[in-house]
A protein has these predicted regions:
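Small-residue (G/A/S/T)-rich helix-start motifs and N-terminal tracts that mark the onset
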Residues: 24, 32, 52, 73, ...
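Short acidic, glycine-rich surface-loop motifs adjacent to enzyme active sites
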Residues: 129-142
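Short beta-strand segments
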Residues: 4-7, 57, 82-83, 92-94, ...
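Glycine-rich phosphate/adenosyl-contacting loop at the front of the ribokinase-like
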Residues: 1-56, 65-66, 237-246
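Short beta-strand scaffold segments in enzyme catalytic cores
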Residues: 44, 91-93, 226-230
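Conserved N-terminal subdomain of the carbohydrate kinase-like
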Residues: 24, 48-130
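Conserved phosphate/ATP/ADP-binding segment of small-molecule kinases
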Residues: 145-233
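Hydrophobic anchor at the start of a short beta-strand
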Residues: 2, 51-53, 78, 162, ...
């Protein structure tokens, strides 16, 4: 069983607006609404791959109700902690004429200490049947930057392998907690190691640097490829993989 954790779950709304211009009134030609947040997206992908998965995290208000109902409709097993504040809504605006994407993200709900404690208790319970726990996405307001790190350390002691996909300070301190895998994108990895990448060698150096911070395995993603460092017993492997183009 894989458990995905989404602290900042959202309702994702995508609007298609051809020839969009700021300061003008437009009518969307299409709209799509779905439950979102990185951890939920991971759970959705695992479900489609027929991998046993349960999604957990924080959900509040009517937006939280909508998130949970959407997951139930998709037959994604879930067990979220209900919180008093409203979960966020994220809006993406697609202009197919210009080939442009604009995104607007809310900060997310305020979370009470007792709500976080309830989530940690739930993780302890779910870890009994979990092989992996995936922590993905940003943290809501008032949640300490070391939340992921402390949760990872606790689960490591319980023999559960943890995956971390976040950014900024939560990523930096989370890597030091020695997760099984950390998966930043290029921008997040550049921020973590303090330099920009311009050629393949920069990515390979960054893999080692991030592993030295504490991560057992590292995957740096780009739009069409990724660079990885994986340890298997006494073997250390580095690779680059290209993603094939898939027609919708």
């Amino acid at each position: 069983m894989i458990v995905t954790v989404t602290l900042n779950a959202a309702v994702d709304r995508t609007l298609t607006v051809p020839n969009f211009q700021t300061g003008h009134r437009h009518r969307a030609s299409a709209s799509l609404t779905s439950a979102g947040g990185k951890g939920i997206n991971v759970a959705r992908a695992l479900k489609r791959l027929d991998c046993p998965v349960i999604a957990t995290g924080l959900a509040g208000g009517r937006t939280g109700d909508r998130i949970i109902n959407e997951l139930a409709t998709e037959a994604i097993l879930n067990d979220f902690v209900r919180i008093s504040d409203e979960s966020r809504t994220s809006t993406a605006l697609v202009d197919p004429t210009a080939g442009m994407l604009s995104e607007i993200y809310e900060w997310g709900p305020a979370v009470r200490p007792e709500e976080l404690e309830t989530l940690l208790d739930k993780l302890h319970y779910l870890s009994r049947v979990a092989s992996y726990v995936v922590f993905s996405g940003s943290l809501p307001r008032d949640v300490a930057d070391d939340f992921y790190a402390e949760a990872i350390r606790d689960l490591n002691r319980r023999g559960v392998q943890c995956v971390l996909d976040t950014e900024g300070e939560p990523l930096r301190v989370g890597v030091e907690a020695e997760p099984f895998l950390v998966s930043p994108n290029q921008r997040e990895a550049e921020s973590l190691v303090g330099q920009e990448f311009s050629e393949d060698e920069d990515f390979l150096v960054a893999l080692d640097a991030i592993a030295d911070l504490g991560a057992r395995n590292v995957l740096i993603t780009q739009e069409t490829s990724c660079f990885g460092l994986f340890r298997e017993e006494r073997t250390l492997r580095r690779f680059r993989a290209s993603i094939p183009r898939v027609e919708p």
